[in-house]
Amino acid sequence: MPGVTPAEVLSNFGITLVEDPADNQPRLLVDLPAAELVEHAIRREEGRMASNGALVIETGERTGRSPNDRFIVDTPDVHDKIAWGAVNRPLSVESYEAIKAGIVDYLNERDVFVTRGMAGADRNHTRRLLVACERASQALFIKQMLARPLAREIARTGEPDFCVLAAPGYQCDPAIKGLNSSAAVVINFQERVILVAGTGYSGEIKKSIFSVMNYLLPVEDDVLPMHCSASMDPVTRETAVFFGLSGTGKTTLSANPTRLLIGDDEHGWSDMGIFNIEGGCYAKCEGLDAFHEPEIFNAVRFGAICENVVLDENRKPNYDDISITHNTRVAYPVEHIPNAWTKGMGTTPSVVLFLTCDAFGVLPPISRLTADAAMYHFVTGFTAKIPGTEVGVTEPTPTFSSLFGEPFMPLDPMVYAKMLGERIADGRTRVYLVNTGWIGGGYGVGHRIELAYTRSLVARALDGTIEDSEFVHDDIFNVDIPTTCHGVPDGILVPRQYWQSTARYDEAAHNLAVMFEENFEKKYSHLPESVKAAGPHAQVHADARHRGRGLLGLRH
């Protein structure tokens, strides 16, 4: 039985375009191949071709996400489920309708590029998507980012589970009640629609779809959605997941030539194992080079889309030039990584790694967590916002982001935390906290840990050999730290011993521990006492200083 056509779907919103209109009339261009989308983008002056074959575009004024312009429509079906607040801002149905009407009128006056894809490699938990874009370059972006359905799946597709209308050139009326600017990213769960207006940053489309899945998977499927990358051992088929906010190393650390890449950013964890929500990767590329990150460097070729990357006079990308933004990005299909596991599915994880970028430089490069400590760090999600990932962020800023992805989680954090706790409760999954940020001092004093060292630490955690090390217990942060690791200088593993001044380290560690405690008391005081007890303890610093002893105790 033939499926519903994109024109029929879009007509429900008032978009009257068709694929074969009369001469010189705007039209729908549906499911174009990547090469044709590149041609359209260049012809329409949306971007330029780089010497490596990638399409290079500029996103305009907004070079990162705009959290203050992200909204969820407050409808009866979600009113009592959404964790409303600064992250999930409510918008009235009336304001939503006004924005949608403007976008529909705007799109009816120009060609619209339609891409059909899927969110979720596991067909038991897939959501079908129809994305209508003003720009060919954004259609190419989402084509490469979504899980790609088979031709026969498209042929029999009925109504999509969600639609996206992306009109970066449309400026909303800031006078519409609830809006903060001329840009708006709006999710309507009742109508199953996402509106993206006034911003050319393609990550808004990607993260809006992720936010939708972060609601639908737990509520409808009992699946834990995760802001993480995932990889697989090619021999044992054991999997690992890497949690972390943008810029903490998820993409870089999961693109490992010795392992199979399942995905770099968004996954689900079901009773059967894990699966990639996407079909592509969206990597930061500031400072990208072939030596340190060859897999990502070589993935930037024809079919990839670079955002805000500067080209030299020979059209060669200059990844060190951040004159447009720190948040230079490249999107490419996962198949561009040679060792990609294109099935996008794997077994229950053997290892979970929480990646944090510590701007204070006091957390160890790697530490082992108990089950309760894993719950603690999952709900608190300490990291630093990296320059460029959000508008206005120009230097690392310490922050607590629940679940290492709070900006994309519509439900109460405890919904997700409880699901993770249930999945690691049997003890088969080892959990580590990995600091990819500063060591030897805070931002401006110390330096960011070398990628090669982090890779070695992660490799030893994945193969289990790090457990052969002697561990010391950090009394302030309440974690166990290995004292040796192959490929890593012993001196950097215990931060207090690496700082030039132990007194300054103690003070900085105490201050961060206080931040942990205050954040926990403010948001999570209702959690079990065992979880609270597994977190940092600022009082330990004062007690130790009073007794004149160190802050580390030996533990095997």
Show where each model-derived region lies:
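Charged, amphipathic alpha-helical linker segments immediately N-terminal to NTP-binding catalytic cores
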Residues: 160-162, 166-218
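N-terminal accessory targeting/assembly segments
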Residues: 1-156, 547, 551-552
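Conserved lysine of the Walker
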Residues: 250
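Glycine-rich, often acidic-flanked micro-motifs
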Residues: 2-49, 227-245, 255-258, 268-498, ...
